[in-house]
Regions:
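Surface-exposed loop/turn motifs in large extracellular/passenger domains
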Residues: 1-258
Length: 258
């Protein structure tokens, strides 16, 4: 898929799982190119009832994508929802072509989810490979309905490489119960992720968490049981948390902010 002259898309899309303004599922061999002199721009609304929903791509496994500006008024789904990419699972490595970046542009727009929502990327994991015979659903993380704890898929292996997200800018508002971040909602525990020179929000931008989103079903409004998340490392008692951050909602030890 590519653009040579006018790299602009506008639509109102509805679906279930794997819904995106450009592609619902972008596999590891796919190529999205833009040879015009203008940034790829997506506008409209993307509304879905399921998982992996993004303003540009629902589920991405490709290692390279073009720069993009997402100017949608709404991106909504159940889990793994991002202003640009819902679930980013590139194979081997991940770059934005020509040193570019992803930006979301409408300050009055919003990203809505029950869990795992990011202004740019909902969920991020660098895969070593995409095993044959494994379904797309099996590659996605699961969330325990009782504890709210997110568990990365064991049907694929995490790559040893590093993902660097540089100069990304989010202007969309975020509405979710748990795992919500201005740039990334949640990063896989083993994926080495560096986020540098990222910007989240304008004066109009607000982070809404903890079951405050009137459009979702409040599936995780009780938050994440922190003791279950921490294992034996800390004792939080019966405390729950939303896991929300201006840049990343759930930052693992392999996550670096610069």
């Amino acid at each position: 898929m590519g653009w040579e002259r006018t790299p602009t898309l506008g639509a109102i899309l509805y679906g279930n799982n794997y819904v995106g303004g450009v592609a619902g599922y972008n596999d590891e061999k796919a190529t999205i190119s833009n040879t015009s002199t203008k940034n790829l721009t997506i506008s409209g609304q993307i509304v879905a009832a399921g998982k992996a929903v993004g303003g540009m791509i629902g589920l991405n496994c490709a290692s390279t994508l073009p720069s993009a500006t997402v100017a949608v008024s709404r991106v909504a789904g159940q889990q793994l929802v991002g202003g640009v990419i819902g679930a980013n699972l590139p194979v081997g490595n991940f770059t934005v072509a020509d040193g570019g970046a992803f930006n979301t542009y409408v300050a009055s727009g919003r990203v809505e989810a029950d869990a795992v929502a990011g202004g740019i990327i909902g969920y991020n994991r660098l895969l070593a490979d995409k095993p044959a015979g494994v379904t797309l659903a099996a590659l996605l993380p699961t969330i325990d309905k009782r504890t709210g704890v997110l568990t990365d898929s064991t049907d694929a292996q995490t790559a040893d490489g590093e993902v660097t997200l540089a100069n990304f800018q989010n202007m969309l508002n975020l509405q979710a119960d748990i795992y919500v971040g201005g740039i990334v909602g949640a990063n896989d525990a083993k994926t080495k992720l560096t986020i540098q020179k990222a910007t989240n929000g304008a004066t109009q931008n607000a982070l809404s968490v903890g079951g405050l989103n009137p459009s979702n079903n409040g599936a995780f409004k009780g938050g994440v049981l922190l003791n279950e998340l921490a294992g034996d490392r800390y004792d939080f008692g019966t405390a729950h948390g939303a896991l929300a951050g201006g840049i990343i909602g759930y930052a693992t030890p392999n996550t670096v902010l610069k």
